[in-house]
Amino acid sequence: MGCGMSVEEKEGKARNEEIENQLKRDRMQQRNEIKMLLLGAGESGKSTILKQMKLIHEGGYSRDERESFKEIIYSNTVQSMRVILEAMESLELPLEDQRMEYHVQTIFMQPAQIEGEVLPPEVGNAIEALWKDRGVQECFKRSREYQLNDSARYYFDNIARIAAPDYMPDDQDVLRSRVKTTGITETTFIIGDLTYRMFDVGGQRSERKKWIHCFENVTTILFLVAISEYDQLLFEDETVNRMQEALTLFDSICNSRWFIKTSIILFLNKIDRFKEKLPISPMKNYFPDYEGGDDYAAACDYILNRFVNLNQHESKQIYTHFTCATDTTQIRFVMAAVNDIIIQENLRLCGLI
């Protein structure tokens, strides 16, 4: 009887070799593919980071893409002024100049979504005039008492340019534009030899149940916290402090069984607004155990420790950065550091170091 392999054995061996080769290819692809989940409470800056990645790694936005942001920026600007005017009524703050009432009516007549290539001149004029009113300014100073877009002041300060007939959004305008993220969006970037698949998920509570679909084989979590919101309440539940909500969410993510081996990068974001707020809104009013007064470094250390100390796994390292997501120069530097961290983590997971 011959000792050669049967047809079935040869076919079986060929199948095994093909499976082994496919597994090798999969491992190589997995080594070069980074699946990053962007997490954080609503309005923490996740979408802004994705825009920065496009600016830094994809050459920025085309003219057509910038055009598409016009209506978003117009709507953000008009709605922000509407929110202030409505807050003035509830806070019983009068206009300094009652002749501004005409401009108030102009704002209230606008639809929720502004459409068109150009902001109507009467709307631009109304915002410019109202922004100079002391009553409006006083209400703006109390914006922690209601829900106002972070970029309101930026757009109001730039209203003459935004309302110009030849207006074209620049990088900063695009970065500061705000559209609520619903569902899950995936964005792919190539950085060196690595392919990043970045998933942005809705931060509001109602969106969180959808995160489960992103959990499998996640390489890294980028968790964002808007530290400037230490004195604000949630949009969806105005009995809950935003920073407390972020701490609760970070605790659940950091110590989740899904993420025992997943590296976590923590961006303590919106440091520019945080630094502005500290002298006028004492952090001790919201966190009674804080003893650092309005010292910026002490406040940063306090918040950093509050988050890092939630980690219950000694083997898990939390990589932290203080960030301003609208500052492209800083984000370019920070993301380069993040890339180095991820490469090391990926090599470790693949057993290469």
Curated annotation (Swiss-Prot):
Matches recorded under Pfam families: G-alpha
Sequence positions that bind GTP: E43, S44, G45, K46, S47, T48, D150, L175, T181, G203, N269, K270, D272, A325
Primary role: Guanine nucleotide-binding proteins (G proteins) are involved as modulators or transducers in various transmembrane signaling systems.
CDD domains per record: G-alpha (cd00066)
Region (G5 motif): 323-328
Residues lipid-modified (N-myristoyl glycine): G2
Binding locations of Mg(2+): S47, T181
Keyword match Glycoprotein: no
Region (G1 motif): 35-48
Subunit relationships: G proteins are composed of 3 units; alpha, beta and gamma. The alpha chain contains the guanine nucleotide binding site.
Gene3D superfamilies in alphabetical order: GI Alpha 1, domain 2-like, P-loop containing nucleotide triphosphate hydrolases
MF term (GO), any: GTPase activity
One GO CC term, this protein: heterotrimeric G-protein complex
Entry-linked SMART domains: G_alpha (SM00275)
Keywords: GTP-binding, Hydrolase, Lipoprotein, Magnesium, Metal-binding, Myristate, Nucleotide-binding, Palmitate, Transducer
Protein name: Guanine nucleotide-binding protein subunit alpha
Region ranges (G3 motif): 196-205
InterPro entries in the record: Fungi_Gprotein_alpha, Gprotein_alpha_su, GproteinA_insert, P-loop_NTPase
Bias type Basic and acidic residues, positions: 7-26
Cofactor(s), by name: Mg(2+)
Lipid linkage positions (S-palmitoyl cysteine): C3
Family: Belongs to the G-alpha family. G(q) subfamily.
Domain G-alpha per the UniProt entry, residue ranges: 32-353
